[in-house]
A protein has these predicted regions:
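Structural signal for interior beta-strand "rungs" in well-ordered beta-sheet cores
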Residues: 100-125
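Terminal amphipathic alpha-helical/low-complexity segments used for targeting or macromolecular assembly
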Residues: 1-104
Length: 125
């Protein structure tokens, strides 16, 4: 079954989706988030001068909020309470080399969620 079908089928029963949902669905959602993070896919893109929204990608993002619980996050400047699955992933644990390889700059306390593609030479504030 394709990722798109898994996501579209789950969307039809979105009110029933929870952290205890099927692992196949979680894997599909996580794969789409990883593909967004790497820039492999986009939620929307311009094709022949027209913007095309990929609905199953948007649905996967929304469903991800249903399969993960709220969490408390503590950092050096503040603490947060949110769906941490997307906050902990983009640069958590990165080394200096990882940041240099990614090619973008993040000033302190600038969040970027997992699933957000950040292009080279960007400065996040």
């Amino acid at each position: 079954m394709s990722l798109e079908k898994i996501i579209n089928d789950a969307w039809e029963i979105k009110d029933q989706i929870s952290p205890s949902s099927d692992q196949k669905l979680k894997d599909a959602i996580n794969q789409i988030i990883a593909d967004l993070d790497s820039g492999k896919v986009r939620a929307a893109e311009k094709v022949n001068g027209q913007w095309i929204a990929h609905q199953h990608i948007k649905k996967a993002i929304m469903l991800s909020f249903r399969i993960y619980p709220m969490e408390n996050l503590n950092g050096p400047y503040s603490s947060w309470y949110d769906k941490a699955h997307l906050l902990k992933g983009k640069t958590a644990g990165w080394s200096k080399e990882d940041h240099e390889k990614a090619g973008f700059r993040m000033v302190p306390n600038s969040p970027v969620r997992k699933g957000s593609f950040v292009g080279k030479n960007a400065v996040l504030m």
